[in-house]
C-alpha cells in the first residue's frame, strides 16, 4: 500500500465527515469530534466525490428517467461538511474559520458552477422535464424547480456567457462574504467604556448589570456599552445622557463607513452592479425582474403597489407619531429643542410611559428566559400536541447550546432542536433559524429522515445577580425564530429540495411572523409570565396595557420597514451601473417613506446585510408581504379560537408540513379558503375599520 493511500485511510478514519453516517443519536453532526483541520479535506473530498457522481450519472447509457437522473443524491458529503462549517461560521466563529471561508468560497462557487453549467447533465434533466406529465404532482414540482434552477444559473446560455456568469457568481460569493465579515468586525471593534456613575443616568438595572458584565469579560473596570442589540437598544431608549446617546448613535450609523479595511462602500457598489450584470446576462432588464419572476409577488409592480398602499395608510399615522414625540420633547426641554435621531427612541419611551405607563423594563421581571421558553414550547404543545425533551446525549457545538428531542403527539420522533440563546464574541448579531439537515423520505427504504434544526438568538446573558430576563420584543423574536423552526420540524414531503423552509422567499416568513401574534395575547402570557423573584403572575392590568400599547408607533415602524424595501428595490431596479454616491442614492431612494431625518454622514447600505449578503436582495419586501399573510392567517384563529386545535391542525397540514410541494398561494388558499388581503393587517394596527 502506498504512503498516499495510508494517509487517506487515516484521514478517513479520523475525519467525521468522511463517514457516510454519523455514529451519534439521530445522526446529529458529532460536534464534540469535529476539529478545524477536518473542514478543508472534507470539502475537497466532497467536491471530488460529487464530481465523480455527476460524471457517472452523465455517462449512464440508459434513457434519462426521474429515478436515474433526479433522485440520486450526489453531494451528501459536501452538504454535510458545508452545513456544519457555514452554520458555525455564523454561530461559533474563529479567525481560522474566516480565513478558510475566504479560501474555500471561490472553490465551492466554481464547483457549483461546473455542475449547473454541465451541458450533458442539463440535457438529461431537460429530457426528464419534457416528460414531466408522466410524473405525480410532487415529482413535477421538484422537476420544475430543478429544471428552472438550471435555467436560472445559465445552463441554456452560450459557452462564453456561461463562463462570464460563472465568474460573476464567484465574485458575488467572495464579496458577500467580505461584506458580512466587515460588518461583524466593525460592529465588534467599537465599545464605549464608562467609568462614572453619572454616565449611567436613566439606565435600568438590567442594562447596568449587562454593561458591568461586559466590562468584566474584557478585564475592565466600570461598564462597557457595545453596538450589539442587547446593549445598544436599551442605552438609546433609557439613557438620560444625550451626549452619550449621540455618541452611540453615530457609532452605530457609521459602521463600515470608516477609512479602514472594514469599509463597505465599494462592496455595495460592486454587489449591486454584479447582480445587475447577472440579471442582464440572464435576459432580464434588472435584478429585481430576475428575482421576482420566481416569487409570490411576481413582479416589481406588485411590490410597488403593496408599498404604495402601506404608505398611503401608515404615513399620516407616522407623521402624527413623530409630531407627538417632538411636542413632548419640547415640553420637557424647551421650545428651542430640536429633536435628533438619537432622541427619538428615548422620548418615544417617555411618551409611551406617559400614555400607557408601560415599558419593557416593567415586563422584564415577568419574562425570565426559562419561563418564556416553557411558554413557547408549551404553546406548540397546546396547538399541535408535540413535546420537547432535553437531550444531554446529543452533542452540541458550544456549552451554551441545549439540544432537545421533539416528539409528535403519538410519541414518534419529529426532529432535533438546538437552542443557542446568548451573545458571544465569535457569534453574529441578530437572530436566525437554520438547519443542519432537512427532512426527506429515503426512496429505497422509505425511511422518513427527520430534520436537525437550530434557533440562534442574542438574548442578554444572566448575571450573578439575576437570571436572563427578556423584553417583550425579545419574546417576539423567540416566537419568530421558533415559527421558522416549526416550519422545518413539521415538514412532511418526499424530497429534500421541497422540504422545510425551501419555499418561495416571500412565503418563508409566514410561519415565523404568524407566531409573533401570540406575544400580546393574554391567554398565552398567562401560561408562563411569572415574576422571577416572587412567582406572582403578570397582573392582568399590565397585560391590558400591553395590548393597548401594542400599536404604539406602528405607523413609524411600518414606514421604516417600507423605507428599507424602497432602498432594496431602488438598488435592484437599476438597469445601468450604480455610479452615484452611495449615501446620496440611499437618501433619494427612501425619501418618500422617511419621517425622521437621517444624519448626513450616516449610511445604512454598508451594513444592510439582508439585501447585500443575506439573501434578501430584491426581496426585503417579503417581510411586509408576510405581515399581510400572517395578519390574515391569524384572523382565522381569532375567529375560531387562538388555541383551537382543529384550526392549528389545518395550519400544520396545509402550510407548515407541505414545504414547497405546491405553489404557496395554493397552500394558503387551502388553509384560508381565499387569497389574503391587507384589511386584517390594518385592523390589527388599529387603522382599518
Task: Name each model-derived stretch.
Residues 23-38, 86-104, 126-167, 226-266, ...:
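Short His/Asp/Glu-rich catalytic/ion-coordination signatures at enzyme active sites or charged loops
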Residues 460-479:
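Short pre-active-site segment immediately N-terminal to the catalytic Zn-binding motif
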Residues 79-87, 144, 148, 344-352, ...:
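Short, hydrophobic/amphipathic alpha-helical patches that form generic packing surfaces
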Residues 10-38, 45, 222, 371, ...:
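C-terminal, non-catalytic "cap/extension" segments appended to globular domains
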Residues 48, 52, 56-63, 80-94, ...:
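Intrinsically disordered or highly flexible coil/loop and linker segments, enriched in small
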Residues 7-203, 637:
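N-terminal helix-rich structural modules
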Residues 138, 142-144, 171-174, 181, ...:
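Active-site-proximal, well-structured secondary-structure segments within enzyme catalytic domains
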